[in-house]
């Protein structure tokens, strides 16, 4: 059953990186277990706007995997109705809170890239803060708001930035921080 679950989760991942004019984007995920709560996804809204999601449902195994699939379906259903990222964050949270088990939550970065204006808009729901990297420094952005699903009436603050020519925007999940090799 876990192998079947892994195959379903793999099928839900994007087959390729998004092709956004003027941008170079690399999405990567490698689950630590057969199935789990990691979500990496994107959806093209129109010729200029693409949304990216990086999320991590708390826990491991089948429960986390099922709630991750539910979260992905919710995001995809609501993404085309964007008025503001704050609003979509509130809607995603309300649905996840309503439909999940008590004390189950997810961290999430929901990012909208506008290739026409060069803007990155995002909300951070309890996820690791994104980084801006250039040849001189690494800058950690805001830690964000409460994780998805903890309370039904959460608020999410939309942040906007425009990258300079030499800057890189990095969004990551716990696998980067918790990864260990034979040297620790």
Please report, for each region that a protein language model flagged, where it lies by residue:
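Short, intrinsically disordered, charge-balanced linker/junction segments flanking boundaries
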Residues: 181-184
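Conserved catalytic-loop aspartate of Hanks-type protein kinases
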Residues: 174
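… and, occasionally, acidic/histidine-rich disordered N-termini of signaling adaptors
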Residues: 1-170
